């Protein structure tokens, strides 16, 4: 039987560090995304099929999937970029000036299919791009083919996992274009969640392997997952922590 040969693949932010132009394109792509409230639920049948694709390529420690969505409009010259927090276990992703970023130390965190049928990062995080093996590339090709076949490119994206992949995380949107913060659920006062946005393959105690929701939107005391900032920017982590505390998210 002939062995399939994959054509060379270079996805900025996944295989190589992004250029300034790549980051500008990422911001444009982000601005076209639907809010999560306007996205349908991912059908369980597709979660089951994608689980099989992930497991068959043995990439469950490296990749998950994400509900494709956005929350704000990114201004020209900026890109959605996430950095680890120092005072809380979490990551703050916000519009960040491209000119001040170290492009060699950032990677695509969430990627969606673009109009040309290729994966494109629309959110970035700290850290160099992952090392991609031929098997990893084969998985990306297989996932792309599945999403295209079932017209899921605007609903399901590829997520590059990090050290938080085993944690239960809660996302809160910050008002006034301050981005969003992802926190360890053990560190918040919020016990409810209402929308799964990130999925990771796990095997439960019964031996069942499936995509489980590990990132969720959770309501604050205002019954929304948005943290209000009264029209004020959040210039630093201290101001973010104060806003989270004021809205009853943390002690």
Question: What is the predicted role of each segment?
Answer:
Residues 2-36, 66-251:
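Detector for the mature cores of small, proteolytically processed
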Residues 44-61, 143, 150-152:
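Short, low-complexity, charged amphipathic interaction modules
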């Amino acid at each position: 039987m002939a062995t399939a040969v994959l054509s060379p693949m270079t996805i900025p932010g996944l295989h190589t560090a992004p250029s300034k132009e790549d980051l500008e394109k990422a911001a444009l792509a982000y601005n076209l995304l639907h809010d999560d409230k306007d996205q349908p639920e991912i059908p369980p049948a597709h979660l089951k099929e994608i689980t099989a694709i992930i497991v068959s390529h043995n990439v469950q420690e490296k990749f998950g999937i994400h509900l494709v969505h956005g929350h704000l409009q990114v201004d020209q010259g900026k890109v959605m970029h996430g950095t680890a927090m120092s005072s809380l276990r979490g990551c703050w992703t916000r519009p960040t000036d491209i000119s001040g970023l170290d492009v060699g130390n950032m990677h695509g965190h969430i990627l969606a299919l673009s109009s040309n049928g290729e994966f494109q990062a629309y959110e970035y995080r700290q850290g160099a791009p992952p090392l991609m093996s031929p098997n990893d590339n084969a998985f990306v090709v297989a996932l792309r083919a599945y999403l295209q076949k079932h017209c899921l490119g605007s609903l399901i994206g590829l997520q590059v996992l990090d050290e938080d992949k085993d944690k239960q995380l809660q996302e809160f949107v910050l008002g006034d274009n301050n981005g969003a913060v992802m926190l360890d659920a053990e560190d918040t006062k919020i016990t409810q969640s209402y929308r799964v946005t990130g999925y990771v393959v796990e095997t439960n105690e019964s031996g069942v392997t499936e995509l489980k929701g590990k990132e969720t939107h959770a309501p604050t005391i205002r019954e929304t997952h948005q943290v209000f900032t009264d029209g004020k920017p959040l210039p630093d982590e201290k101001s973010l922590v104060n806003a989270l505390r004021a809205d009853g998210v943390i002690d």
